[in-house]
Swiss-Prot record:
Catalysed conversion reaction: (4aS,6R)-4a-hydroxy-L-erythro-5,6,7,8-tetrahydrobiopterin = (6R)-L-erythro-6,7-dihydrobiopterin + H2O
UniProt keyword list: Lyase
Family in the record: Belongs to the pterin-4-alpha-carbinolamine dehydratase family.
Organism placement in taxonomy: Bacteria, Pseudomonadati, Pseudomonadota, Alphaproteobacteria, Rickettsiales
Organism: Rickettsia felis (strain ATCC VR-1525 / URRWXCal2) (Rickettsia azadi)
Pfam short name (any one): Pterin_4a
Record-level GO BP terms: tetrahydrobiopterin biosynthetic process
GO MF assignments: 4-alpha-hydroxytetrahydrobiopterin dehydratase activity
Protein name (database record): Putative pterin-4-alpha-carbinolamine dehydratase
Length: 110
């Protein structure tokens, strides 16, 4: 099995169904972290930091990955925290690329 963080995000042009719950659950296990699927059906994780500057530095690292992968999460930055929400906008659901991006984000601090 290929590690998610070693894969590339594939741009979605729509016309495909979102992942089913069974597939989502398998991919969540592969992330091996505290990512969740929120009430909107998006991948979500809140990272905590000792201050605003560290949260912003983390967000900037995510920006670099997002640009490389051409897949962009929603980020909410506050004092001591950066929340990340990922989904494939074209289908308003989750694809494997969402999990690939989450894995790459997860590797920032490892």
């Amino acid at each position: 099995m290929t590690v998610l963080s070693e894969k590339k995000c594939i741009p979605c042009e729509g016309g495909i169904p979102p992942l089913e719950k069974k597939e989502i659950d398998k991919l969540l296990v592969q992330l091996q972290s505290k990512w969740q699927v929120n009430e909107l059906g998006h991948l979500y994780k809140k990272y905590k930091f000792p201050n605003f500057v560290k949260a912003m530095e983390f967000a900037n690292k995510i920006t670099e990955i997002a640009e490389q992968e051409a897949h962009h999460p929603d980020l909410t930055i506050s004092w001591g925290a950066c929340s990340v929400e990922i989904w494939t906008h074209k289908i308003d659901g989750l694809t494997e690329s969402d999990f690939i991006l989450a894995a790459k984000i997860e590797s920032i601090n490892s």
